C-alpha cells in the first residue's frame, strides 16, 4: 500500500524504517510537501545558527548538533546516528569510525594544502554523504556542513545548482549523477555542480 508521506519520490531518497517513521514529531504532517516544508524551516534556522557563531565544522559534536538543529523540530532521532542498514552508506557500526577518519583526512588536506578550499569542501561533502550517518537528511546536512567548511577556509558558500535539491527534478538528478561520479573517483562533476 502506498503512503503519500513516506513513499520515496525518486530512487536516491533514503527510505525510513517503521521505527524511524514513528519519530515524526508534528502530528499535523500527513503529506510529503508538509514534511518538506517543516524540515525546510528547521534547516533555515540551523543555517542562521551555524553561520552566526564561531564553530569548528571538523568536530563530530558540531556535526551532530548541526543535524539536530536542522531536523530536531521534526524528528525525535535528529542528531543521532542511524542504527540500521541502508541502501547507501557504511554499516551502522562503522559510522563513528568512518566519520572520525573523514575529519582527520580533511584536517590533513587543509594543513598540507592538498586541495583548494572548494575541493576540500566538496570532497568532505561527498564522503559525509557516503558515510550516511543519520536516518535521513544526510545530503542536506552534508551540503550545509560543506558550505560552513568552505567559509571557514576563506571561500564563498557553495551554490549547489541554485535549486531545491529535495524535489525530484532535473537539478536533483544532476546532483545525484555528480555524487555517483564521485563514488567512481571522478570528483570533477560534483565540484562543477557545487559552483553552478
Locate the predicted segments by residue.
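FIC/Doc superfamily catalytic core
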Residues: 1-196
Amino acid at each position: 500500500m502506498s503512503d503519500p508521506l513516506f513513499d520515496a519520490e525518486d530512487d536516491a531518497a533514503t527510505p525510513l524504517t517503521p521505527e524511524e517513521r514513528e519519530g515524526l514529531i508534528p502530528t499535523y504532517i500527513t503529506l510529503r510537501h508538509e514534511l518538506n516544508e517543516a524540515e525546510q524551516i528547521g534547516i533555515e534556522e540551523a543555517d542562521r545558527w551555524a553561520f552566526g557563531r564561531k564553530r569548528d565544522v571538523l568536530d563530530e559534536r558540531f556535526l551532530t548538533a548541526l543535524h539536530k538543529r536542522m531536523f530536531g523540530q521534526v524528528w525525535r532521532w535528529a542528531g543521532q546516528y542511524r542504527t540500521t542498514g541502508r541502501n547507501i552508506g557504511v554499516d551502522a557500526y562503522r559510522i563513528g569510525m568512518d566519520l572520525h577518519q573523514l575529519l582527520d583526512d580533511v584536517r590533513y588536506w587543509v594543513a598540507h594544502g592538498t586541495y583548494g578550499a572548494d575541493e576540500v569542501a566538496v570532497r568532505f561533502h561527498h564522503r559525509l554523504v557516503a558515510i550516511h550517518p543519520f536516518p535521513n537528511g544526510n545530503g542536506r546536512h552534508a551540503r550545509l556542513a560543506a558550505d560552513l567548511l568552505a567559509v571557514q577556509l576563506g571561500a564563498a558558500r557553495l551554490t549547489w545548482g541554485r535549486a531545491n535539491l529535495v524535489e525530484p527534478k532535473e537539478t536533483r538528478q544532476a546532483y545525484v549523477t555528480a555524487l555517483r561520479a564521485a563514488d567512481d573517483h571522478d570528483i570533477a562533476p560534483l565540484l562543477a555542480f557545487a559552483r553552478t
